[in-house]
Amino acid sequence: MKASIQLLEGSSFAGTSGSGHSVTLDVAPEAGGRNQGIRPMEMILLGLGGCTAIDVLQMLRKGRSNVTDLRVEVNGERANE
């Protein structure tokens, strides 16, 4: 796996995965960003939730469950600096 992160403007970045998918990242306006993309820490939560959802779905399907809906909620709290 690999990923490439390229500065666009200000605090915005384009992130591109090894499979060619892209996402725009930015920091919050109160941290100097312009709210042009998802926050990097939010990406961590999405990655965790996505991996969990895919693993659960594969296990359910392996057990021959007919899954028509699946939702994973992930909450995180950033440590105080």
Task: Set out the residue ranges of the language-model regions.
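Extended beta-strand/beta-hairpin segments
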Residues: 1-46, 57-81
